[in-house]
């Protein structure tokens, strides 16, 4: 049962991060979250409009 709870928690966190990145994708270049010894870095690749 604890493994199932951990898996559900991980899925919720991943979906939340994906939704956040999707909502601010036009103004977000990079995201860095740090909690204890864990660091999550997300960087978006984009091309400059000419």
From Swiss-Prot:
Recorded topology in the membrane: Single-pass membrane protein
GO cellular component, as recorded: plasma membrane
Record's subcellular location: Cell inner membrane
Transmembrane region(s): 5-25
Keyword terms: Cell inner membrane, Cell membrane, Membrane, Plasmid, Toxin-antitoxin system, Transmembrane, Transmembrane helix
Pfam families: HOK_GEF
Principal cellular location given in the protein's record: membrane
Function description: Toxic component of a type I toxin-antitoxin (TA) system. When expressed is involved in cellular Mg(2+) release and degradation of stable RNA.
Annotated family: Belongs to the Hok/Gef family.
Name of this chain's protein: Protein PndA
Source species: Escherichia coli
